[in-house]
């Protein structure tokens, strides 16, 4: 299974450049801040397993002279392994034009997706399939801003596209040539939906957990 690397960019913006960097801006404090945020995410039951609502994915593609058109209904979709997220290496803090930024990487080797798939291609082809995959690199962008007293709050949070998705479809039999067509359609439409659902679920959790951050 491919290594999952999550690049998280924490930007602490809107601050005046100071002659001496405050204690909570050193690398140790950045690591401490990020570790608290990560811990709060990995302990949430909603995160693992993460369930995706039923959705219908359109299929419309030409292979040579053959035009394949129809849909695939995704049911009982579940992403597992998100709770294994952890920080790797130190957060690095740099200053640029009075802003502070920390870059770090989080890693995991257990991200998987499983779903039932009902294929509807014309009047004849309606198989029920089992669909599973391994998800590769995911980028996560997290921006924090500080008020005048140095208290952090969430400024921006988003998840980039799921890349390096390795998919396996069971139950096609003689329809195996359709694997690539189904996989391409799945990634194209599942990617934005899954990203939005994960983002919408995590964002309010982040807002509350950032309020609880304690820097020693």
UniProtKB/Swiss-Prot annotation:
Residues 1-19 form the signal peptide. InterPro entries: Mite_allergen_7_sf, Mite_allergen_group-7. It is found in: Secreted. Pfam families: Grp7_allergen. Its main location: secreted. Keywords: Allergen, Secreted, Signal. Disulfide bonds: none annotated. One of its GO terms (cellular component) is extracellular region. Belongs to the mite group 7 allergen family. This is Mite allergen Lep d 7.
């Amino acid at each position: 299974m491919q290594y999952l690397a999550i690049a998280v960019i924490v930007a602490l913006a809107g601050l005046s450049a100071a002659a001496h960097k405050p204690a909570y801006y050193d690398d140790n404090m950045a690591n401490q801040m990020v570790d608290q945020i990560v811990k709060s995410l990995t302990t949430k039951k909603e995160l693992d397993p993460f369930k995706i609502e039923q959705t219908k994915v359109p299929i419309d593609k030409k292979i040579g002279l053959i035009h394949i058109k129809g849909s695939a209904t995704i049911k009982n979709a579940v992403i597992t392994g998100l709770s294994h997220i952890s920080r790797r290496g130190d957060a690095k803090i740099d200053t640029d034009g009075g802003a502070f930024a920390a870059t770090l990487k989080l890693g995991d080797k257990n991200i998987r997706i499983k779903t039932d798939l009902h294929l509807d291609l014309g009047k004849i082809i309606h198989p029920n399939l089992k669909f599973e995959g391994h998800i590769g690199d995911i980028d996560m962008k997290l921006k924090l801003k500080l008020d005048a007293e140095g208290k952090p709050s969430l400024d921006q949070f988003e998840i980039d596209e799921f890349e390096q998705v390795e998919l396996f479809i069971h139950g096609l039999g003689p329809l195996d040539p359709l694997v690539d067509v189904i996989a391409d359609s799945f990634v194209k439409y599942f990617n934005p939906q899954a990203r939005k659902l994960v983002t919408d679920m995590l964002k309010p959790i982040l807002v509350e957990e950032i309020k609880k951050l304690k820097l020693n």
